[in-house]
């Protein structure tokens, strides 16, 4: 019964898609407002709190999961599993955001990285690799392709660039009334994708003490391929 219900929930109707777009619009707006505050001296928890407040101000019923903000770079050697702290952020740090809104029960899930100061050559390179991995996964996400094939498309780009050790998770998941719904875009998942599914594509590269970059958008699968319902650009944002 659970499998049948998951299959029904995976395909969204037009009303559900409209609510998902509204939820995506909230997180786009919030990042645009919060990104300029990513400067040396601010703490991760301050940024996370600002995200949560602004999501509610823009109509979200709350966060679709605990908001995560964490820095990575030469000044921070901790592992990426620590997703928010009271640490003050320093110049030379890339600050990754992972958060989602809720619109009438329907969730969004979103991520970007904002750099404090001029990014190093490696940061720029890793950012380009992560964006290329997301695009490869998007192109692989066509009706009839399996969830695993989408994951492997992103994995291939990152492995070939030499950063495979820094990509430690599945590339995405379906999303709707729950922020994490089946099928999951993981190596072992053979579920065929169908039009009407909405799912995240969220590759990342995290190398403690060096660099951390993530991107996450929600995509709608149509008859001709995957369409990003988020509007935020994919440039590496750098604040002075």
Report each predicted region and the residues it spans.
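Active-site neighborhoods and metal-handling regions in enzymes and metal-associated proteins
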Residues: 1-240
């Amino acid at each position: 019964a659970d499998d049948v219900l998951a299959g029904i929930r995976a395909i969204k109707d037009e009303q559900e898609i409209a609510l998902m777009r509204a939820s995506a619009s909230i997180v786009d707006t919030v990042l645009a407002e919060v990104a300029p505050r990513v400067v040396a001296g601010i703490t991760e928890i301050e940024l996370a709190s600002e995200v949560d407040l602004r999501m509610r101000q823009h109509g979200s019923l709350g966060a679709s999961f605990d908001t995560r903000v964490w820095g990575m770079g030469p000044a921070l050697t901790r592992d990426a599993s620590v997703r928010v702290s009271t640490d003050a952020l320093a110049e030379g740090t890339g600050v990754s955001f992972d958060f989602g809104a809720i619109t009438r029960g329907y969730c969004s899930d979103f991520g970007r990285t904002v750099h404090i100061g001029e990014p190093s050559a490696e940061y720029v390179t890793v950012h380009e690799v992560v964006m290329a991995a997301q695009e490869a996964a998007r192109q692989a996400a066509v009706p009839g392709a399996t969830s695993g094939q989408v994951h492997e498309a992103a994995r291939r780009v990152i492995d070939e660039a030499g950063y495979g050790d820094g990509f430690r998770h599945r590339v995405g998941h379906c999303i709707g009334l729950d922020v994490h719904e089946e099928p999951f875009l993981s190596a072992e998942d053979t579920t065929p994708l169908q039009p009407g599914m909405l799912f995240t594509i969220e590759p990342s590269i995290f190398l403690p003490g060096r660099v951390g970059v993530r991107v996450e958008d929600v995509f709608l699968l149509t008859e001709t391929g995957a369409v990003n319902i988020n509007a935020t650009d994919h440039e590496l944002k750098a604040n002075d």
